[in-house]
Amino acid sequence: EHIKILLESASYAPSHFNSQPWRFVLIRDKARREHLGRIAGYSMREVMTKGNFWKRYLKYFRFSKEEMDKAGDGIHIDNMPSVLKPFIKYLFSEKGVEMMNKLRVPYILAIDSKKLVSRSPLILGVLLTKDEYKKDEHSGMYSLLSLGMAIENIWLSATALGIGVQFISLPMEAGGAYWQACIDLVQPPENYELVALFRLGYIDPNAKRPTIDWSSTQRKPVSEFCYEETFGNKWIPNCDCYFT
């Protein structure tokens, strides 16, 4: 079974003292997935309506392939209703929040978010043990690094199996009652903390894209983020002398 393959791949991730601080909760029940979908939808509407999301992440929004090629990072908003296209740069700006609300963009995004989460056959709850995940101690950072590697193992294995993975971030962005509702759904014991939620499902190449959607395939060249010996000393590619 593919789920077993994904979880076993996570188990092979390195962790400090082989502590394996992660735990995973599989949510497959239709009613529970739909409940989480509603939480995701309401969270999306809340965050987008207030506009804080745009202020925080606007620097990563790109509106053309040329912008993506130049920046090498961010997300390219490349799918939206034609009626919105003339206003796109204004809408996705700090000043455009009011117009965005008038055009009901947060509601469009909320409906799409609800559908995406509800229709995903598997939701993965990711937890860390509080015995190791202590935010004011080194073990807290070690635990997060270990968990990141475990999730990466899952992601790579999923990709090889034709399974898509997406982080369900909006309930956490909205915080408060929205994130608490997710915690209540997962029901972690006192000594475990819910850290993240992901949705998984087999990729359908013919599936209709969300009403407003983006792509993020662009990457910076290695020379832009790698340095030699000290930060700022540009690394020169094609020098493998240290491996000979």
PLM features: what roles do these ranges have?
Residues 1-244:
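Acidic, surface-exposed loops and disordered segments
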